[in-house]
C-alpha cells in the first residue's frame, strides 16, 4: 500500500478522507479526540505544500449528531492554528470552484459527506466509482489520502470509490492502526488473550469464533452483555429480570450461536463467576453458585463481580498479547465501573503488547485516567471486523489502488 512518504505533494490537491464523526452537544463538539488523531497527517500535507480538501461524515441521517461540518472547520482551525475554510457543498460547482481556488498549504473542509444520498449506502468499488461524488471530485483532485480507519469496514464512495481513479494513500493514522492490529493478530507470542465486553454481541461472537478457530487466541475473557449471552449459553440462570432485559434487546437470539461456539471451544472461553447488581441503588455482589443468586430474578446485572475482575487480572498479567473491546459493565455509574476499571488497569499494567478499541472503552479509560495500554484504536466496529477475519473494504481499496498505480508513481 502507498505511504505518504512515497509522494511529492507540493502544489497538488489532496482529498483527505478522515473520520471526524464526534459526539456533540448544543451544536458543539464535545470530544476532539478524532481530530487530534489525524493532525499528524494534516500537518504533514500542509508542510509538504499540498492543497488539502478534507472530507468527513458526521452522524447518521435524522440523528441528533447529524449536522454540518462548520463546527469541524472551527475546531480544526484552532488545533492547526490556521484558517480552515468550510465549504457548504460536497461536489457541486461551488465546491469544485472553491477547491480550485486553494493555494499551497491551505486547508478546506467539505460539507458533511452523508448529506449526499450516495454516501449513505455500502456498495462495491465498481458502483462507488460511478457516483457523482467520485466523478465530480476526481476532476479537481490529484491524490486521495485515506486516514479514516474507524470507517474502514464500510464500502462507500468517498472511502473506496477513488481506488482505481486516483492514487489512494494511507495516512499516518491508518498506517499506525494497521500495523498495531496486524501485530496483535499475527504475533506468535503467547499467551494471547482477548477481552470482549460491551453490547456488540453479534460482532463479538464472530471475533471469538474466528480467533479460536484460527488459533489466534489462547483464551477469551468476557464481560458486559457478551458475558451474559455466554453465561446463559453455559446453562446458568441469570434470573427473570435479566433474561427479560436481554429479550427486549434481541440478545437471546445469539444464545444458540454462543452454545455452538462453546461446544467447540468451551475451555477457552471464560465467563464471570460473580456479578454486581443494582440493589436499590447500591452495588451488591452475587456469586453465581451462592444462595443469594435469587436476587438476579429481581435486580439487573450492571457489572462483573470483584472476584471475576481479580481472576481476569491474574490471567492478563501473564499475557504477551492482549486485544480488548468493550467495557465490563455500566462504567458510567461509578459504583459499577469497578469491573471495567480493574480489567483495563490490568491490561495497562501487563507487560503485554495491548490493543484496546471501541468508543465506550476509550471513554472509560479517559474518564478514569487509565494509561499504559500500548495502542488505543480509533475504530470500534472496524477493529471487531478485522479480528473477526472479515475483509475491510478500505484496506482492499488501498491495495487495489497500489496495484493500479505503482508503476505510474515510480
Curated annotation (Swiss-Prot):
Question: Which keywords fit this entry according to its UniProt record?
Answer: ATP-binding, Cytoplasm, Glycolysis, Kinase, Nucleotide-binding, Transferase
Q: Which residues form the signal peptide?
A: none
Q: Which pathway or pathways does this protein act in?
A: Carbohydrate degradation; glycolysis; pyruvate from D-glyceraldehyde 3-phosphate: step 2/5
| Molecular function terms, GO-annotated | ADP binding; ATP binding; phosphoglycerate kinase activity
**SUPFAM superfamilies tied to this protein:** Phosphoglycerate kinase
Q: What is its EC number?
A: 2.7.2.3
Per UniProt, ATP binds at 332, 358-361
Among the Pfam families in the record, one is PGK
**Domain of life the protein comes from:** Archaea
The record's principal subcellular location, in a coarse class, is cytoplasm
Residue numbers binding substrate: 19-21, 34, 57-60, 114, 154
Q: Which GO terms describe its cellular component?
A: cytosol
What GO terms describe the biological role, i.e. biological process, of this protein?
Answer: gluconeogenesis; glycolytic process
Q: What does the subunit section of this Swiss-Prot or TrEMBL entry state?
A: Homodimer.
HAMAP family for the chain:
Phosphoglyc_kinase
Q: Which family does it belong to?
A: Belongs to the phosphoglycerate kinase family.
Name of the protein described by the UniProt record: Phosphoglycerate kinase
Say which species the protein is native to: Pyrococcus horikoshii (strain ATCC 700860 / DSM 12428 / JCM 9974 / NBRC 100139 / OT-3)
Amino acid at each position: 500500500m502507498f505511504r505518504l512518504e512515497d509522494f511529492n505533494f507540493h502544489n497538488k490537491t489532496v482529498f483527505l478522507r478522515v473520520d471526524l464523526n464526534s459526539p456533540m452537544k448544543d451544536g458543539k463538539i464535545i470530544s476532539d479526540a478524532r481530530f487530534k488523531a489525524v493532525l499528524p497527517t494534516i500537518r504533514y500535507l500542509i508542510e509538504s505544500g499540498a492543497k488539502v480538501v478534507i472530507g468527513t461524515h458526521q452522524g447518521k441521517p435524522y440523528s441528533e449528531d447529524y449536522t454540518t461540518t462548520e463546527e469541524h472547520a472551527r475546531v480544526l482551525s484552532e488545533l492547526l492554528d490556521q484558517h480552515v475554510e468550510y465549504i457548504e457543498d460536497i461536489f457541486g460547482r461551488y465546491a469544485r470552484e472553491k477547491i480550485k481556488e486553494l493555494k499551497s498549504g491551505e486547508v478546506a473542509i467539505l460539507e458533511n459527506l452523508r448529506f449526499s444520498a450516495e454516501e449513505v449506502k455500502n456498495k462495491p468499488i465498481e458502483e462507488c466509482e460511478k457516483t457523482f461524488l467520485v466523478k465530480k471530485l476526481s476532476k479537481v483532485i490529484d491524490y486521495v489520502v485515506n486516514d479514516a480507519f474507524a470507517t474502514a469496514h464500510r464500502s462507500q464512495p468517498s472511502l473506496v470509490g477513488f481506488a482505481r481513479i486516483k492514487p489512494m494513500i494511507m495516512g499516518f493514522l491508518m498506517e499506525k492502526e494497521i500495523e498495531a492490529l496486524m501485530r496483535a493478530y499475527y504475533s506468535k507470542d503467547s499467551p494471547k488473550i482477548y477481552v470482549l465486553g460491551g453490547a456488540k454481541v453479534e460482532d463479538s461472537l464472530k471475533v471469538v469464533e474466528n480467533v479460536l478457530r484460527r488459533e489466534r487466541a489462547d483464551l477469551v475473557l468476557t464481560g458486559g452483555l457478551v458475558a451474559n449471552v455466554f453465561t446463559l449459553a453455559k446453562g446458568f440462570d441469570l434470573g427473570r429480570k435479566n433474561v427479560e432485559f436481554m429479550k427486549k434487546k434481541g440478545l437471546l437470539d445469539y444464545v444458540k450461536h454462543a452454545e455452538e461456539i462453546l461446544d467447540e471451544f468451551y475451555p477457552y472461553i471464560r465467563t464471570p463467576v460473580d456479578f454486581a447488581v443494582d440493589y436499590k441503588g447500591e452495588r451488591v455482589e452475587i456469586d453465581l453458585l451462592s444462595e443469594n443468586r435469587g436476587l438476579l430474578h429481581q435486580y439487573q446485572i450492571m457489572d462483573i463481580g470483584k472476584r471475576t475482575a481479580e481472576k481476569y487480572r491474574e490471567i492478563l498479567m501473564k499475557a504477551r498479547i492482549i486485544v480488548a473491546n468493550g467495557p465490563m459493565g455500566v462504567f458510567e455509574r461509578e459504583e459499577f465501573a469497578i469491573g471495567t476499571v480493574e480489567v483495563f488497569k490490568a491490561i495497562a499494567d501487563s507487560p503485554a503488547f495491548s490493543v484496546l478499541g471501541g468508543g465506550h472503552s476509550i471513554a472509560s479509560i479517559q474518564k478514569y485516567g487509565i494509561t499504559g495500554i500500548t495502542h488505543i484504536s480509533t475504530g470500534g466496529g472496524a477493529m471487531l471486523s478485522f479480528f473477526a477475519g472479515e475483509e475491510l473494504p478500505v484496506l482492499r481499496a488501498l491495495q487495489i489502488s497500489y496495484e493500479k498505480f505503482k508503476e505510474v508513481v515510480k
